[in-house]
Every structure is written in structure tokens, then in C-alpha cells.
């Protein structure tokens, strides 16, 4: 269920303050954050935000297509290594 329009998008205050401060200085340093739940807003376009995935900070470069999505969508928390190989697939078939 999406958030109500009268409330507006959720963005952590500390993250928005850091983005606004860099916009005022015209600075584009990497911003580290643990806030995966923050919504990407137009002020963040062009910034690189390092989002924590539980192990490390994954750099996410924000562009126009990401507006309205959450930061956590671009920092996967699980690694997929593929399904296990079939033991009989190597060539030793039973007859």
C-alpha cells in the first residue's frame, strides 16, 4: 500500500540535511547512510549515496528514473550463488 499523498514522501532528516548542504556548496562527495527506507527525492539527483546492505556500503548514483523509489531497492542484501548442480548431470547416467 503506497503512502498517503497528503503526508508526502519519507526521507530521513539527517540524510536530507546532508544532501541540501552539499547542494548549497555544489559539492558531490559520497554520502554514507544506513537509511534504506528513505524515498529518493529530486534533490538527490546527481549525488552518490552509499547505502548499507548489512555488510558494506554500496554506492548508488541517483538519476531521474529512481525518483519515488526507496534507497534500499538499489542495495541488495542477499547474494544469489545459483542453485546446486545436479549430481548426475556430469555424464554418469544410470542405465
UniProtKB/Swiss-Prot annotation:
Keywords: Ribonucleoprotein, Ribosomal protein, RNA-binding, rRNA-binding. Disulfide bonds: none annotated. It comes from the Bacteria. Residues 73-95 are annotated as: Disordered. GO terms for cellular component: cytoplasm; small ribosomal subunit. PROSITE patterns: RIBOSOMAL_S19. Gene3D superfamilies: 30s Ribosomal Protein S19, Chain A. InterPro entries: Ribosomal_uS19, Ribosomal_uS19_bac-type, Ribosomal_uS19_CS, Ribosomal_uS19_SF. GO terms for molecular function: rRNA binding; structural constituent of ribosome. The keyword rRNA-binding applies. One of its GO terms (biological process) is translation. The keyword Secreted does not apply. Protein S19 forms a complex with S13 that binds strongly to the 16S ribosomal RNA. Belongs to the universal ribosomal protein uS19 family. HAMAP family: Ribosomal_uS19 (MF_00531). PANTHER family: RIBOSOMAL PROTEIN S19P FAMILY MEMBER, SMALL RIBOSOMAL SUBUNIT PROTEIN US19M. NCBIfam families: rpsS_bact. This is Small ribosomal subunit protein uS19. It comes from Deinococcus radiodurans (strain ATCC 13939 / DSM 20539 / JCM 16871 / CCUG 27074 / LMG 4051 / NBRC 15346 / NCIMB 9279 / VKM B-1422 / R1). The gene is rpsS.
Amino acid at each position: 500500500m503506497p503512502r498517503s499523498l497528503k503526508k508526502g514522501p519519507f526521507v530521513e532528516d539527517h540524510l536530507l540535511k546532508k544532501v541540501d548542504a552539499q547542494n548549497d556548496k555544489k559539492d558531490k562527495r559520497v554520502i554514507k547512510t544506513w537509511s534504506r527506507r528513505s524515498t529518493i527525492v529530486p534533490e538527490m539527483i546527481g549525488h552518490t549515496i552509499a547505502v548499507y546492505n548489512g555488510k558494506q556500503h554500496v554506492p548508488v548514483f541517483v538519476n531521474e528514473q529512481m525518483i519515488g523509489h526507496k534507497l534500499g531497492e538499489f542495495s541488495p542484501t542477499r547474494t544469489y550463488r545459483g542453485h546446486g548442480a545436479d549430481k548426475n548431470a556430469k555424464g554418469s547416467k544410470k542405465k
